[in-house]
A protein has these predicted regions:
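Non-heme di-metal
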Residues: 2-224
Length: 224
């Protein structure tokens, strides 16, 4: 299992590019760790879908709202509001629930509790209402989600499901969302810079650990 030393101490003139590069490296590593769906048991496939659903259905809108509350830039708020508008208007949680049920992977209490510690840490981080760090965390998550959708669809297919609305929509729309959130990050940093001792990647690292728990189960995350 690869680990990262997340370095927030970047030069101003290359800050945006450097941050996006670091995020791309982290996402590439997470995608590279994904198991082959064909080598997984039905229960392992079900568990990944169930843990993903247990986290995403009730938390994504909450997390994006937390970022909206945290930011100071008036230019950033419409970017986050547009993301939330799409989530609510198009009922993305309904899409996810349909996808999960069709794959016979509706989360159990055990599924939810298996990621509870990592999920709680992300929630507590967002409760600090730090604009820059919150936006970066959501940019990272959108970047990972759009890369993860093909794998998630393959898991569902192996479970006998043909339901694809959720994975098809997010495999496309989250590309735009990622780009917009990185633009929002630069706008927020211009008016609400973080302090010299702040960890820019605090939320990213916590969310990375949650993703590992979703994909590999909580035992795997102890070594991450």
């Amino acid at each position: 299992m690869s680990t990262f030393t997340l370095d927030p101490r970047l030069h101003d003139e290359t800050l945006g590019v450097s941050i996006q590069h670091q995020i791309a490296v982290i996402v590439d590593d997470l995608i590279g760790q994904l198991p082959d769906p064909a080598r997984l048991t039905a229960e392992q496939r079900r568990g990944i879908i169930a843990r993903y659903s247990a986290v995403l259905e009730g938390n994504f809108i909450y997390w994006m709202t937390a970022a909206y509350i945290a930011v100071k830039s008036e230019e950033v708020r419409p970017i986050l509001a547009e993301n939330l508008f799409e989530e609510i208007r198009d009922a993305h949680p309904v899409m996810l629930r349909k996808f999960t049920i069709a794959a016979h992977a509706f989360p159990s209490e055990n599924d939810a509790m298996s990621v509870d510690r990592e999920l709680t840490e992300v929630r507590l981080f967002l409760g600090k209402v730090q604009g820059v760090q919150s936006v970066l965390t959501m940019a990272f998550f959108e970047c990972w989600i759009q890369r993860f959708m093909g794998f998630l669809a393959d898991l569902a297919s192996a479970q006998g499901s043909a339901e694809r609305e959720y994975t098809d929509v997010h495999g496309v729309c989250d590309i735009t969302h990622t780009a917009e959130l990185f633009r929002a990050l630069q706008l927020e940093m211009a008016v609400n810079p973080i302090g010299p001792d702040a960890n820019l990647f605090e939320g990213v690292d916590l969310l990375r650990k949650l993703i590992i728990a979703i994909v590999h189960g909580p035992a795997e995350n102890t070594a991450a």
